[in-house]
C-alpha cells in the first residue's frame, strides 16, 4: 500500500500527513499516540482503503516532519492544543465529517474535537486512555485506590527523577515494581 506524504498549513503548524485511498472515500483520520507515529497504522490503512475509505494519518505536533510555523510558538501537549490542531487540520484539508480514530494523545485530540465540534465529526473511535481531562477536578486528590494504581506518575514528577539518565530511571522503576509485586 503506497501512501503519499503531504503537508498543509494551519494557524500554528505545517502538518505533515500521509494519505491513501480515493478522494471520494469516507474520510478517516487516524491519530497516533505518544511516542509513536503514523507507522502505527500501517496494517490498518490497507483495510480502510479496501473498504473504500480515504485514510489520512497526520504526524502530531512535535513528530516527524510536522513543524511549528514560528519559533516563538509555545510547545505544548495540552489537550486544547492537540484538539485545536486536529480541528484546524480538518478545516485545512476541507474534509467533511470524517471519522476520527486515535489512541493516547491522538485519542484525546479526537475526543476534544468530537466534544467541542460534534457537527464536524461522523464518528469517533478512541482507545487506550487519555480522553478529555477535567482540569479543575485534576487539582483535587484522587481516591486512595486510584492513587495507589498511579503511583508511578507521582514518581516521574518527583525531584528524584530530574536529571537522571534513562537507565537509572528504568532501574528505579524496576525496583519499585518488584517491591510492589512481592508485597
Residues covered by each model-derived region:
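Alpha/beta-hydrolase fold catalytic core
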Residues: 1-28, 50-54, 72, 95
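Secondary-structure boundary/capping motif
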Residues: 3-11, 38, 44, 54, ...
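Conserved phosphate-coordination/catalytic loops
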Residues: 11, 35, 80
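Flexible "cap/lid" subdomain of the alpha/beta-hydrolase fold that forms the substrate-access gate
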Residues: 14-15, 27, 63-101, 105-183
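Conserved HGGG/HGGXW glycine-rich cap/lid loop of the alpha/beta-hydrolase fold
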Residues: 18-68, 89
